[in-house]
């Protein structure tokens, strides 16, 4: 069994819980509140900047030239997507540049970006790869499910198209292939660290979407 298959099977419970979140179900049906989606877009833009930086560190740690190119390009794309959010979704949902810049990271976003940043700088290349993989892979699988269940004229169709398109899925398959290639060289201790990093990333994917649906800032301090 490929290492990626082991990752998926070990964490299938988290994927199913993520898929079942009201945010994703209502997004597919076009009934998600604009406020919840706007909250998500702002936090996703903050997240993507940190994700891009983590990808750049991953590229610097890569073993082979092809991997350096792969993750350098992925880092660039993360920033391009972050900027496109300003020009498309934020404009569509009346989120001004000032509102975005004045909105701090939520607890979920802060936790996720801090985990990725700390892992990128302090862990080995294989572990960094495993930590970054959930964002690629879970988004791709959720995107496919949403396409299968989406209504016609969905107000969130542009977002659905972004994460369900063939270009994104090709990139995801390439990252999975790199993870398998690198994992094949790793000892048992490193593989377990990769499993732990992937599971934490998968947990934080769930938390990010759940937090967006609840429009939660800092749990317990939202009204302080």
List where the protein language model places each region.
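Alpha-helical bundle segments that constitute or directly flank the non-heme di-iron/ferroxidase center
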Residues: 12-17, 32-61, 81, 130-140, ...
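Short alpha-helical hairpin
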Residues: 8-33, 51, 174-185
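A non-catalytic, amphipathic alpha-helix used as a structural packing/dimerization or gating element
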Residues: 39, 43-50, 73, 77, ...
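Hydrophobic alpha-helical segments
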Residues: 1-3, 115-117, 164, 210, ...
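Active-site-proximal alpha-helical scaffolds that flank and shape metal-associated catalytic sites
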Residues: 66-170, 199
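Amphipathic, well-ordered alpha-helical segments in soluble domains
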Residues: 19-20, 47-54, 81-85, 108-112, ...
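Acidic, carboxylate-rich catalytic segments that either coordinate divalent cations
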Residues: 194-224
């Amino acid at each position: 069994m490929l290492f990626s298959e082991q990752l998926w099977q070990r964490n299938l419970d988290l994927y199913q819980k993520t898929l079942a979140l009201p945010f994703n179900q209502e997004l597919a049906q076009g009934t998600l509140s604009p406020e919840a989606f706007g909250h998500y877009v702002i936090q996703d833009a903050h997240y993507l900047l940190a994700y891009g930086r983590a990808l750049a560190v991953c590229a610097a740690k890569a073993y082979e030239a092809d991997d350096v190119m792969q993750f350098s390009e992925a880092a660039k794309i993360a920033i391009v997507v972050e900027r496109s959010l300003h020009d498309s979704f934020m404009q569509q949902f009346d989120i001004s540049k000032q509102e975005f810049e004045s909105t701090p990271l939520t607890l979920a976003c802060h936790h996720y970006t801090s985990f990725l940043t700390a892992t990128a700088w302090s862990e080995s290349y294989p572990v960094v790869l495993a930590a970054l993989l959930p964002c690629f892979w879970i988004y791709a699988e959720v995107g496919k499910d949403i396409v299968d269940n989406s209504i016609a004229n969905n107000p969130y169709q542009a977002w659905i198209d972004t994460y369900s398109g063939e270009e994104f899925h090709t990139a995801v398959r390439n990252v999975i292939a790199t993870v398998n290639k690198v994992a094949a060289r790793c000892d048992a201790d490193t593989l377990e660290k990769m499993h732990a990093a992937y599971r934490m990333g998968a947990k934080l994917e769930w938390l990010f979407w759940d937090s967006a649906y609840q429009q939660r800032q800092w749990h317990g301090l939202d009204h302080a």
